[in-house]
Every structure is written in C-alpha cells, then in structure tokens.
Design a protein with these regions (language model features):
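Short hinge/gating elements
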Residues: 1, 39-40, 110, 169, ...
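Feature representing long, continuous alpha-helical segments
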Residues: 5-8, 13, 17, 51, ...
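Composition- and surface-driven signal marking solvent-exposed, interaction-prone regions
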Residues: 3-7, 27, 50-54, 114-117, ...
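Terminal appendage regions of diverse proteins
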Residues: 22-24, 32, 124-230
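Secondary-structure capping and boundary motifs in well-ordered enzyme cores
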Residues: 2-3, 7, 45, 137, ...
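Active/ligand-binding-proximal structured segments within catalytic/core domains
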Residues: 1-39
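Non-catalytic interaction/regulatory segments
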Residues: 39-138
Length: 230
C-alpha cells in the first residue's frame, strides 16, 4: 500500500505539470495491488499527455527522492503551501508528506507537499516502477487514472510483451516491425473492401441488365416480372 500511496502523490504532481494546477484530486483508492486516482479535468487526456505523466512519475521514482513525514499545525502547513483536499475537514494538527528534491532540500525545495495521514515509503525509488493501465471518465468533468507499481507494473509489462511476441509470431515478423506490419495489413484490408464494394456494384448492374432482356410490353406498357432472392 505504501508503494501505491507514494506513487499517488507523484501522479498528482505530474498531472499538475502536464495538464494544469486545476487537475486536483477528486477521489482515490490505494490498495496493495493497484491505485486509482480521480481528478478534475474537462476532457480526456491525449495519448501523449498520458505518456508524459507516466514518464514524469518514473523519473521522480528514479531520482530516489526522500519522503518526509512531519506533524505540525494546520496553519503552519498552509503557510508553507501544503496541498489540501477540497472539502476535506482537518484538525488543528495535521500530518504532512513532503517529497524533497534532494536530501539537502529546504522548505522551498519540495517536489511535492501534501496533507496526508496515510502510510508512505521513505524514498521514491522504493516505488520501483509506475505504469498507467487506463485513463477514462469517472463522472462529468472528472477523469480517472488506474495504475500499478512495483511487481504489478513488472507483471503487466511481461504480459504485454508476451502478447507482442505472440502477435509478431502470427504476423511472421520481428517485434520492431509489428506496427508497420499491422499498418500494411490495415491498408490491404481497406483496399479489399473497396474492391468488394466495386464487385458488388458491378454484379448488381449486370443482373439488372440481364433482367432488362425479359421486359415485356403489355398494352404499350413495359413490364418486368422477376423473382428476387431474399
């Protein structure tokens, strides 16, 4: 749980950097297997934004930053710029979680600073790895990110890599060439669909022309009687 909780703080920071400081927490779930983070944002994130957030969190993990837990007065924490959850009720004494940019950081060198009573790691490197599983809508104006860390991230990467290798085997190509092979197959399917549509049109016209040969004139009126299958 500590791994996913500390990763949640890093994710919150990354969303502020990539989207805006209005991407504030609107709910979260921290479990031993994964994390879920809801935040305010009017539209879905682009694949590029998701990639940037994921990269930023992993860079913070690799930076091996210290995570400091301190209990202090609510007024003091607010004066220092600690981030508080909107609508949350706090007592006069609160617990703060600071992720420092280095072991020698001062108050002004905090990478992340939030009010939080949960359990956390001692250093960001203990997160191990961070991988976003999905990003989608949780409610109107609220987005949701689900992610895994540590062993969970490793296992998901292994699962996806296995799928990629199986796909490469089916396509009879190398792992690096899978995207190009898929693009080529999509182009081929698109062309085949066009050819099929053209053949259907030609067949329909040919059938119609054959039927015209059976037109009979009844009292100066051209009549065509035919049985149409289906």
């Amino acid at each position: 749980i500590m791994r996913n909780h500390t990763a949640t703080h890093l994710l919150h920071k990354a969303l502020h950097e990539v989207l805006s400081d209005q991407a504030k927490q609107a709910g979260s779930l921290v479990s031993p297997t994964h994390l879920r983070f809801d935040f305010n944002h009017p539209e879905g994130m682009t694949p590029e934004q998701v990639e940037r957030v994921e990269k930023m969190v992993n860079e913070a993990v690799a930076a091996d930053m210290p995570v400091v837990k301190v209990t202090k007065s609510l007024d003091e924490a607010k004066k220092e710029g600690a981030m508080a959850l909107f609508g949350e009720k706090y007592g006069e004494v609160v617990r703060t979680i600071s992720i420092l940019e280095s072991d020698n950081s001062t108050v002004g060198n905090k990478y992340s600073y939030e009010l939080c009573g949960g359990t956390h790691l001692d250093r960001t490197s203990d997160v191990g790895a961070f991988l976003i599983v999905s990003e989608g809508s949780a409610a109107a104006g609220v987005r949701r990110i689900e992610a895994v860390t540590g062993r969970g991230a490793y296992e998901l990467i292994q699962k996806r890599f296995k799928t990629l290798k199986q796909t490469a085997g089916t396509l009879k190509t190398s792992l690096d060439e899978v995207p190009a092979k898929v693009d080529a197959l999509q182009d081929e399917v698109s062309e085949l669909k066009k050819e099929l549509a053209s053949l259907r049109t030609q067949t329909a016209l040919s059938t119609f022309n054959l039927q015209l040969a059976n037109v009979q004139t009844v009292r100066d009126v051209n009549v065509l009687a035919a049985e149409i299958p289906n």
